[in-house]
Amino acid sequence: MSDRPHTPLLDQVTRPADLKRFSDAQLTQLAGELRAETVSAVSVTGGHLGAGLGVVELTVALHAVFDTPRDKVIWDVGHQCYPHKILTERRDRIRTLRMKDGLSGFTKRSESPYDPFGAAHSSTSISAALGFAVARDLGGVTPEGLGDAIAVIGDGSMSAGMAFEAMNNAGHLKKRLIVILNDNEMSIAPPVGALSNYLSRLYAEEPFQELKAAAKGAVSLLPEPFREGAKRAKEMLKGMAVGGTLFEELGFSYIGPIDGHDMGQLLPVLRTVKARATGPILLHVLTKKGKGYAPAERARDRGHATAKFDVVTGEQKKAPSNAPSYTAVFGKALVDQAARDDKIVAVTAAMPDGTGLNLFAERYPSRCFDVGIAEQHGVTFSAALAAGGLKPFCAMYSTFLQRGYDQVVHDVAIQRLPVRFAIDRAGLVGADGATHAGSFDIAYLANLPGMVVMAAADEAELVHMVATAAAHDDGPIAFRYPRGEGVGVEMPELGKVLEIGKGRMIQKGARVALLSFGTRLTEVQKAAEALAARGITPTIADARFAKPLDRDLILNLAHDHEALITIEEGAVGGFGSHVAQLLADEGVFDHGLKFRSMVLPDIFIDQSSPADMYAVAGMNAPQIEAKVLDVLGIGRIGEKRA
């Protein structure tokens, strides 16, 4: 007996075109079946549940009305795309979401023609849709053709400047472009800022029940340029016209808000937009994150991303923890430092829970700032906090900090302002794949004059690095740490301030030195144990700092060993490259040192478990062991010693 839901209509759907033969009542039933199938699939795989459940009706309506893949539906962020994937010839693989060799948890061009533009970071959809619209009008060609361009963007994503840059440009170009504002009053955390308040007022100004009834006759509601006599409709629904002023000033015709879970509203409005739209139009749709699944509705923030769970109870099936997560360790360590220094403040970009700053916000709400999905603003805001005499910790994922890189250079580094960058999700992150990998921050930060760059080898080291950053006032400082649990080391009661630019010796050996930067140290130690069985005892050191380098440690390792190997969870151009530059400048290579640098390969690694991803990268213990044997000219693993 199968525990999968009963889905008689969904079973008849192999591609979106099949939806066009269903009646509106059947499409409503189909939405219910699609919601049940989404819950069932995510219970097996884990993933982003709440966002997808909130757009089930919208997904069905879009594919029923428009002609995908000729019409380009572009999902902002892409984490809400699971129902879309089920309808677009991928239902048979939906229970491989976020797994090795499975479906991506986001939209991905290489996966399906129904994913015209990949995503995983926010606020890109309007720019992409505008690009497709211009390409269409200038005779561009794609295998599926070019029809309408539809961006579906959440209210949280609208807090990013990029979305408004795109809307401003679209209003100027006046191309036929459809933007659907999916307003669920929530991104990952509750939304913040003036725009959120504006949307809330817009919703409140028009009694929603009256709006629901009126929207049934959507053709008569549409503002200019869609219908003669629209002036009367605007008078009838004054809140719609007045409420949309912000978007209309940007050059968009505005419709809404309408109920995003009522097919009786969605279908006629979308059909009329498709039939009559000329220039850019914004359709404001109200939805509920987690809609239709009680556990997700009750805890919408936690419903954003879940582990595998029991469908009946919603209880997540998490393996017991052996050590605290790095994120939790950072959050607690920062709270401890803030208790001793009232100048410490914290900044995050819509990720208080993901970065561990929820702990800080609970204790010190007036000293914690969630700037929304606005990394550029967040970095410059932090810079000015530092210029004003405070001690800001700017906590962001490595992959998202990329969005604020110009601000890191221009507003922080050049002015030598003591912003403390807490860089979470460093290295390879697992199920979220290449879009969320923290591969590049070592390279893009360590090349900046005056920037201090640290990496924690374990959770205790992270506590010390938080303390070090808190004490550092001579310019910017960054420390990176991975997703997931620590390694189970004994934790200090309070962090100690590390000497800037000084590493530590872990184990003394001979012939080969392994210099680790970050949490690959654990794999290095495992490799050393395997090498010991072969009679090889490598020296092991933890660099702690990529900038400034511990010159004495590195030069001594080079002088005392036949070979030196660096290991880091980052791309080429990072720690190993800086070590190589030092060795070259000091003429060490002139005297025969064998040097190797183990870095992430020059590819984007698809989702899998972190261990599998590091195996692909060639950076697990067996591969480190093999590198040592190779550089020493000893037989490969598996070959017997002579």
Curated annotation (Swiss-Prot):
This is 1-deoxy-D-xylulose-5-phosphate synthase. It comes from Ruegeria pomeroyi (strain ATCC 700808 / DSM 15171 / DSS-3) (Silicibacter pomeroyi). Keywords: Isoprene biosynthesis, Magnesium, Metal-binding, Thiamine biosynthesis, Thiamine pyrophosphate, Transferase. Its cofactor is Mg(2+); thiamine diphosphate. The lineage of its organism: Bacteria, Pseudomonadati, Pseudomonadota, Alphaproteobacteria, Rhodobacterales. Binds 1 Mg(2+) ion per subunit. It comes from the Bacteria. Homodimer. Mg(2+) binds at residues 155, 184. It holds the Pfam family Transket_pyr.
